[in-house]
């Protein structure tokens, strides 16, 4: 690739988190870079070393991130390149906030580019999985069929006892509704079993031969009612909140250009390249996104799979939240946030609260606007409380999410 000519200005997309200090969570102030390559505010690093929270026995001047460092205290110098970037970012942010609306973009960029979803499974794999599922259904139906004779004999015995104990001369006719129902059910099970076995044979033939056409696979799946999206896991709603469970969807208007969403708008991924979405004041300048659904009353519950994201935040925010601020750093947003080992925290009313538990694989979010309550749970077989706070907003609240923008491929998924 040809290099840019000297003096050529190359646009670079930066967010506050790209130039922030992991210690104070703010923009770098007098940035200094350690030999390992990690940068921090000079004073933040000094204070941390003095408090001995970053050091280890063998290396008291360790980097707070990678825990590497020299045995002797290093001389800290200002990083002029980083300082220049921070100054330019701060000035650009002020101009963007106070300046006029930018000129209209070309029409070709007015519509967000549909996110490309990578196909992870071949048709053969899908057919093989369907074959296994149908096989399980066949076993279930056969099991039910074997249980029918015992049920029938139990029914006959019960009818016989009733007949002997009855003081009247009433008898159960051969066309008793109970007996007719049993006969019809038995016939229906046999029909279902025959249909399933035919489908099973067809699927097995497709696996051993060439890949079945997509339309044929869809028709076979539809005939037995097997229509789950193989890419997305089945939702695990905590039983305590099942009556209020929802599956909100991401709002494309607020979606950062660093992010992409899946076709069903329930998975958000850190993009490997900046997306050419149409610019508007509703779009986040950092790696965040809101959901389309807004809540101003009642109770709602949803779950988020965080297993495939190294740094994330999950919470709620009003639509009017500033688009250059992170969740929890405004008066109208609340969240829990995971930034790596020993960096699990909650943010409410612009205040940080450290959380002692480890990162949850699935986060359950309970929003009770009648009581003004927001609670987060770690969801496995049952929900375990993580954090609870009060919420108060004059505007409806939306589910809100943040992903670390420098880890392409990381994603969060609403279950």
From Swiss-Prot:
Pfam families linked: SPRY, zf-C3HC4_4
Zinc finger (RING-type): 21-67
Enzyme nomenclature, EC number: 2.3.2.27
GO BP terms in the entry: antiviral innate immune response; free ubiquitin chain polymerization; positive regulation of interferon-beta production; protein homooligomerization; protein K63-linked ubiquitination; protein polyubiquitination; protein ubiquitination; regulation of innate immune response
Main subcellular localisation: cytoplasm
A single Gene Ontology CC term: cytoplasm
Pathway(s) where this gene product acts: Protein modification; protein ubiquitination
CDD domains in UniProt: SPRY_PRY_RNF135 (cd12902)
GO molecular function: identical protein binding; ribonucleoprotein complex binding; RIG-I binding; ubiquitin protein ligase activity; ubiquitin-protein transferase activity; zinc ion binding
InterPro entries, sorted: B30.2/SPRY, B30.2/SPRY_sf, Butyrophylin_SPRY, ConA-like_dom_sf, E3_ubiq-ligase_TRIM/RNF, PRY, RNF135_SPRY_PRY_dom, SPRY_dom
Compartment list: Cytoplasm; Cytoplasm, Stress granule
Keyword Metal-binding tagged: yes
Coiled coil: 181-206
Top-rank taxon, per record: Eukaryota
B30.2/SPRY domain residues: 228-415
Catalysed reaction equations from the record: S-ubiquitinyl-[E2 ubiquitin-conjugating enzyme]-L-cysteine + [acceptor protein]-L-lysine = [E2 ubiquitin-conjugating enzyme]-L-cysteine + N(6)-ubiquitinyl-[acceptor protein]-L-lysine
Protein keywords: Coiled coil, Cytoplasm, Immunity, Innate immunity, Metal-binding, Transferase, Ubl conjugation pathway, Zinc, Zinc-finger
UniProt domain comment: The B30.2/SPRY domain mediates the interaction with the substrate RIGI.
PANTHER family referenced in this protein's UniProt entry, alphabetically: B-BOX DOMAIN CONTAINING (PTHR25465), E3 UBIQUITIN-PROTEIN LIGASE RNF135 (PTHR25465:SF41)
Function: E2-dependent E3 ubiquitin-protein ligase that functions as a RIGI coreceptor in the sensing of viral RNAs in cell cytoplasm and the activation of the antiviral innate immune response. Together with the UBE2D3, UBE2N and UB2V1 E2 ligases, catalyzes the 'Lys-63'-linked polyubiquitination of RIGI oligomerized on viral RNAs, an essential step in the activation of the RIG-I signaling pathway. Through a ubiquitin-independent parallel mechanism, which consists in bridging RIGI filaments forming on longer viral RNAs, further activates the RIG-I signaling pathway.
Quaternary state and interactors: Homodimer. Interacts (homodimer) with RIGI (double-stranded RNA-bound oligomeric form); involved in both RIGI ubiquitination, oligomerization into filaments associated with viral RNAs and the bridging of these filaments. Interacts with UBE2D3 and UBE2N; E2 ubiquitin ligases involved in RNF135-mediated ubiquitination of RIGI and activation of the RIG-I signaling pathway. Interacts with PCBP2.
UniProt-recorded name of the protein: E3 ubiquitin-protein ligase RNF135
């Amino acid at each position: 690739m040809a290099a840019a000519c000297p003096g050529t200005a190359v646009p670079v997309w930066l967010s506050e988190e790209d130039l922030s200090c992991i210690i104070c969570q703010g923009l770098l102030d007098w940035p200094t870079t350690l030999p390992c390559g990690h940068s921090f505010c000079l004073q933040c690093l000094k204070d941390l070393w003095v408090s001995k929270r970053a050091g280890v026995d063998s290396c008291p001047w360790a980097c707070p991130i990678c825990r590497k460092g020299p045995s002797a205290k290093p001389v800290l110098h200002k990083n002029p390149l980083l300082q220049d970037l921070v100054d330019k970012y701060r000035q650009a942010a002020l101009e963007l906030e106070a300046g006029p609306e930018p000129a209209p973009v070309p029409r070709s960029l007015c519509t967000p580019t549909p996110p490309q979803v990578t196909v992870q499974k071949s048709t053969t794999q899908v057919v093989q999985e369907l074959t296994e599922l149908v096989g399980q259904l066949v076993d279930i139906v056969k099991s039910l069929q074997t249980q029918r004779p015992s049920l029938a004999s139990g029914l006959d015995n019960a009818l016989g006892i009733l007949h002997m104990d009855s003081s009247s001369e009433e008898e159960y006719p051969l066309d008793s509704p109970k007996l007719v129902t049993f006969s019809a059910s038995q016939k229906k099970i046999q029909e279902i079993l025959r249909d399933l076995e035919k489908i099973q044979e067809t699927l097995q033939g497709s696996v051993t031969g060439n890949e079945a056409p997509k339309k044929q696979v869809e028709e076979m799946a539809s005939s037995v009612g097997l229509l789950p999206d193989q890419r997305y896991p089945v939702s695990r709603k905590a039983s305590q909140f099942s009556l209020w469970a929802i599956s909100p969807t991401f709002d494309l208007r607020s979606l950062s250009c660093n992010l992409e969403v899946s076709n069903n708008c329930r998975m958000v991924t850190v993009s490997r390249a900046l997306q050419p979405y149409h610019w508007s004041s509703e779009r986040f300048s950092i790696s965040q996104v809101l959901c389309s659904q807004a809540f101003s009353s009642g109770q709602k519950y949803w779950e988020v799979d965080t297993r495939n994201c190294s740094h994330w935040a999950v919470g709620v925010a009003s639509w009017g939240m500033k688009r250059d601020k992170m969740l929890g750093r405004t008066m109208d947003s609340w969240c829990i946030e995971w930034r790596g080992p020993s960096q699990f925290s909650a943010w409410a009313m612009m205040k940080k609260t450290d959380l002692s538990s480890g990162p949850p694989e699935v986060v359950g979010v309970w929003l009770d606007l009648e009581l003004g309550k927001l609670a987060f749970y770690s969801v496995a077989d049952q929900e375990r409380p993580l954090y609870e706070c009060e919420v108060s907003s004059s505007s409806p609240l939306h589910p809100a999410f943040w992903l670390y923008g420098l880890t392409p491929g990381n994603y969060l998924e609403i279950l």
